[in-house]
């Protein structure tokens, strides 16, 4: 049943071409915009408070990524979340580097508190830090394994009413009463910058067509990353192949290659 929902969500994104508003970091804007286009969605990078009322009135979802955070960005992010709330739209929070500095940690928590409908997507160290536990981090990279963050993820589900996606060698999608484990992807993927940020952007696209868990996006990127790596000579060709495979992915291939366990 879950597999059918995932494949239907892929078709829905391509048919509906939802607009996804991204307040994201300078490093990954190009990557995430291209990934959204390749999957069939419509990206816009909107950072101004002056246009956010209009943007969130017709956008499908809001993605907040704190990767290049500063004091100018913070009030814009909060205001955007308020407008998403006013329009009943899902907010996807990517707490990049949460735990590496108090600014990142407190900003992430403030956004999580503000959002009415929330999906949190982070690596294990970010999820652990967001929940207030001691995490091992090296900049924005995780030093904790995905399963080490399951307790923290369940806390965030209860605390914020959120769905939580823990990405890593194994991906976990944690919702109230259910945990889904995905075992796709490839060991080369962490060598391409912004791979997690790309997942967060895709999560926004799938949220816009009804997936309020983050499962469909994680399933798609895991399968696509696996396929893209088969012909890749290194991170450069993997990044290029990834866009092609996002564009080419069909329901049958997704269902056939998906490695999923539910508990």
Swiss-Prot record:
Disulfide bonds: none annotated. One of its GO terms (molecular function) is hydroxyethylthiazole kinase activity. InterPro entries: Hyethyz_kinase, Ribokinase-like. It catalyses: 5-(2-hydroxyethyl)-4-methylthiazole + ATP = 4-methyl-5-(2-phosphooxyethyl)-thiazole + ADP + H(+). Keywords: ATP-binding, Kinase, Magnesium, Metal-binding, Nucleotide-binding, Thiamine biosynthesis, Transferase. ATP binds at residues 121, 167. Its EC number is 2.7.1.50. GO terms for biological process: thiamine biosynthetic process; thiamine diphosphate biosynthetic process. SUPFAM superfamilies: Ribokinase-like (SSF53613). Substrate binds at residues 45, 194. The keyword Magnesium applies. Its cofactor is Mg(2+). It comes from the Bacteria. Pathway: Cofactor biosynthesis; thiamine diphosphate biosynthesis; 4-methyl-5-(2-phosphoethyl)-thiazole from 5-(2-hydroxyethyl)-4-methylthiazole: step 1/1. Pfam families: HK (PF02110). Belongs to the Thz kinase family. NCBIfam families: PRK09355.1 (NF006830). Catalyzes the phosphorylation of the hydroxyl group of 4-methyl-5-beta-hydroxyethylthiazole (THZ). HAMAP family: Thz_kinase (MF_00228). This is Hydroxyethylthiazole kinase. It comes from Vibrio campbellii (strain ATCC BAA-1116).
